[in-house]
Amino acid sequence: MFTIITGAQFGDEGKGKIVDLLAKDYDIVARFQGGNNAGHTVRVGDEVYKLHLIPSGILLDARVLIGPGVVLNPEVLAEETAMFEKHGIKVDAEKLGVDAKTSIIMPYHIEMDGLREAARKTKIGTTKRGIGYAYIDKVARDEIRMAELVDKERFLKRLEELAPQKEKEIEAMGGDPKIVRDPFLIQKYLELGEQFASYVTDVSREINQALDEGKHVMAEAAQGTHLDVIHGTQKFVTSSSTIAGSACANLGVGPTRVGNVIAIVKAYITRVGEGPLPTELSGELGEKIQKAGGEFGTTTGRGRRCGWFDLPLLKKAIALNGYTEISLTKLDVLTGLEPLRICVGYKYKGEDLDYPPELTEDLWECSPVYEDLPGWETDLTEVKAYSELPENAQNYIKRLEELMKVPINYISVGPGREQTFKKE
């Protein structure tokens, strides 16, 4: 069975927690896009693990894989493996595999990313971690891959081939071109290559063999649907494709293998950085949700903008991903809010819309049309079953199901593993 999990909003929906919950039933969990610009948090008891590269299934028995559609900063990978080993969790080549064709984020990518964002008149909210420039090099066939990082001779040869052009580009951007051939940084990367040499694998082959043997494989996305490089709110998007179809393309798995596609949906909506957010709440109410939900980025620490549930954006996410079920997160954050509002459509230049306009500049001009529901005062964080939820919380969930036309199978009422239950 091949299952794909993606975020249905702008990222930060709680994918890490749900993947961690479900991974016990899977033999392999594979990350298929993005880099360390994305972050996911997994809480086990009193321990909190903040991850940027390693898939969330690392904490259970699953083998975890990083596919060739990911752009990988080996320094971050080393930091994460060290963090786990500090907590007594061994992350060796039997536990973690990285595809040979995975593109490597080089120091010059990070330098160029920062220079480009500083020069922009309109900021797009990049994390300045070199993700975009690593993807540019991948498309231009100018990347350094994992297979080259772990082979000293190949790595140095490839770097010499690329260095003159990279130095010219950095100098033209007003930066210091010496970073490209900095001996200290080169030595650091050679050591990282040596550290991870045994981790190199063929991810597509591993996954397809596992599926042939009847094993269960989960593909884990980073970020969210509306940050997709093609279908998202351009130009305020990430550099990779974040939707379910990308899992097949990037991991090398045929679409007929897909069994389930699970959406992770927050009970409200958030966005970090720039870009349109039609239901955004400014002032005291927005701050209240931000504080109650701990809405601060795992990667950047930036406060997330908060808004009411946006159905038109969800409809588009459902169309783009073909979801078979939904996991609803952070329901507890809505406690004490009266009324609860669901955006069921937009007003755009006098027209009524029930689906987002294609162009970002038009989405900026959309005003939300709300349906109001009564809220609840009960603290939900100790709730262990759907039947224990207050009536108005159940009614909110039922209404979302009616509107989305996709079943909600899991509900989360807090950050802990034990704070998620099935909707029976």
Swiss-Prot record:
Binds 1 Mg(2+) ion per subunit. GO terms for molecular function: adenylosuccinate synthase activity; GTP binding; magnesium ion binding. Mg(2+) binds at D12, G39. Gene3D superfamilies: Adenylosuccinate Synthetase, subunit A, domain 1, Adenylosuccinate Synthetase, subunit A, domain 2, Adenylosuccinate Synthetase, subunit A, domain 3. The keyword GTP-binding applies. The keyword tRNA processing does not apply. Keywords: Cytoplasm, GTP-binding, Ligase, Magnesium, Metal-binding, Nucleotide-binding, Purine biosynthesis. Pathway: Purine metabolism; AMP biosynthesis via de novo pathway; AMP from IMP: step 1/2. It comes from the Archaea. Belongs to the adenylosuccinate synthetase family. Plays an important role in the de novo pathway of purine nucleotide biosynthesis. Catalyzes the first committed step in the biosynthesis of AMP from IMP. This is Adenylosuccinate synthetase 2. It comes from Methanosarcina acetivorans (strain ATCC 35395 / DSM 2834 / JCM 12185 / C2A). The lineage of its organism: Archaea, Methanobacteriati, Methanobacteriota, Stenosarchaea group, Methanomicrobia.
